[in-house]
Regions:
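Rhodanese-like catalytic fold shared by cysteine-dependent sulfurtransferases
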Residues: 1-30, 38-72, 80-116
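Short, surface-exposed ligand- or partner-binding patches at beta-edge/loop junctions that are enriched
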Residues: 75
Length: 116
């Protein structure tokens, strides 16, 4: 079963994952996209190991070259911006998009590993 298949449906068309449901290292074929700004990515909250920084404003332009068959997990500080990014990917035709509920705040609260 893929990570996407195990995730919970969200009414916006993507799926939701809790920090405990996101395995690190990431399974093959899963891309973790952090949509925060560069200073947040390396700041106090750090980032999930394996995450790629793609600030929210640049997601539509960068997603043009992404593999639409891959699974994507979007993350931000609290889940709001990543939810917007997930919704944008769904509208652009991506079929396997997930949002990390609670973002890096929830990730840190769960005591999970981060990088800076």
């Amino acid at each position: 079963m893929s990570l996407f298949d195990a995730a919970r449906p969200n009414p916006a068309g993507f799926k939701d994952l809790s920090p405990a449901e996101l395995p690190v290292p990431l399974p093959e074929g899963v891309r973790l996209i952090d949509v925060r700004e560069p200073h947040e990515f390396v700041g106090e909250l750090g980032h999930v190991p394996g995450a790629t920084l793609v600030p929210l404003a640049t997601v539509p332009a960068q997603a043009v070259s992404w593999d639409r068959s891959a699974e994507y997990v979007m993350v931000c500080r609290s889940g709001g911006r990543s939810g917007q990014a997930a919704q944008a990917l769904v509208k652009a035709g991506f079929g396997k998009v997930m949002n990390l509920v609670g973002g890096m705040l929830a990730w840190n609260q769960a005591g999970l590993k981060t990088e800076k």
